[in-house]
Swiss-Prot record:
It comes from the Eukaryota. Its cofactor is pyridoxal 5'-phosphate. This is Aspartate aminotransferase 1. GO terms for molecular function: L-aspartate:2-oxoglutarate aminotransferase activity. It catalyses: L-aspartate + 2-oxoglutarate = oxaloacetate + L-glutamate. In eukaryotes there are cytoplasmic, mitochondrial and chloroplastic isozymes. It comes from Pseudotsuga menziesii. Its EC number is 2.6.1.1. Keywords: Aminotransferase, Pyridoxal phosphate, Transferase.
Length: 46
């Protein structure tokens, strides 16, 4: 893996490869609670 700074590594940093940082996923335990939290988060982020 060429990081562009002259250092080669066999593994990626904890953030992963920047080209793939476009999608995020979340897993919840309960259906209704997860829907409520998703709605709350979408309203509060605006």
């Amino acid at each position: 893996l060429n990081l562009g700074v002259g250092a080669y590594r066999e593994y990626l940093p904890i953030e992963g490869l920047a080209a793939f940082n476009k999608v995020a996923t979340v897993q919840g335990l309960s259906g209704t609670g997860s829907l409520r939290q998703a709605l709350y988060d979408s309203i509060s982020s605006k």
